[in-house]
Amino acid sequence: MGGLEPNDEDLWASLRLNIGSFMTTLFRQGAFQGSTPSQAFFVKVDHETTTQADINNGIVNVLVGFAPLKPAEFVVVKISQAAGQSV
């Protein structure tokens, strides 16, 4: 992730994998509600989160949602990063 990777499906898959792995670790530590990872959180990075205009501008957008331990709906965080730069 980062470096000079192109802002494409490969980068997005890498982001989903790495962020998903981090969120799964938090899930296993009891950080979220839900009995399965898919009930506890989601990671979305694709053509819906990152438009062609974003790609043209070198921006990748990631949505991360999670079900907090305290009663609430999902908390959703949008992260934008210039592709090819360190996070």
Regions found by a protein language model. Give the residues of each.
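Structured, hydrophobic secondary-structure cores that serve as assembly/anchoring elements
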Residues: 1-87
